[in-house]
Amino acid sequence: MRTPQLSLLVAAILVASASTATSAYSQQTAPVPNVRSFVQVIRLKPDMVNEWIEIQRNEVIPAQKKAGITSRTTLTTQVGNAFEYSIITPFPKWEAFDSDAPLVKALGRDGAAQVNAKLRKCIMTQYSYMTNRVDSLTIPAPDALVWRIAVRRAVPGKMNDYLAYYRAEVLPGLRKAKASGQIAGSTIAIRGVGAPSGEFTTVTYYANFAGIDGGDPLVQALGREAADRINAKSAEFSTATQVFVRRRIADLSF
């Protein structure tokens, strides 16, 4: 989920500025990312997974709710790095870092230190980054079990074009796939501080893993010829770097 100080600024400039490219999409106004989240990606020690889950369930989540965290999504990687978990929480303003962390607000400094000490014993590696979801390009599916995540990198100067292409070409097909029950939803999010510049994700949500067996939702919704034409255009604006599948953990989310 990676120079961090500049990446959010670069992503914002790429989205907000008009592209100088001559593609058919260059004159369209791309939507601005408007929901920012803080993502933690945690690799656990294999023998400490169950303990970490119990600490999250019994200590961390109650403290987060007490501190006023409004939502949290916890994912485990089904296909990708083993023993890897992701926690996504809202991050509306940077001023959040000027005050106490949620655990400190809820438990006090001593209580938070005790919980963090327990968590550190479970963790092998951990990193974090910001992500900016584009709401106008999102088909919501907040409780979807399965997330198929494609990490992509925009061709320099082409982020604006990619978002316009996605809105004009991809989103209508995904809406049709949603209406027919082939997918639960979808979203696109631009990664910011903590991630490489120009990196973004497209996420397809499914109610279960069997949904992935249907293949490309654009093929299902529009037919092979139309889907191939649409997919071929994406190479003008971005390259795919990684695809993996994650599962939402309901009792570690709220």
Segments predicted by a language model, with ranges:
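Short S/T/G/P-rich N-terminal loop/turn motif that feeds into the first structured element of a domain
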Residues: 22-254
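Bacterial N-terminal signal peptides that target proteins for export
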Residues: 1-10
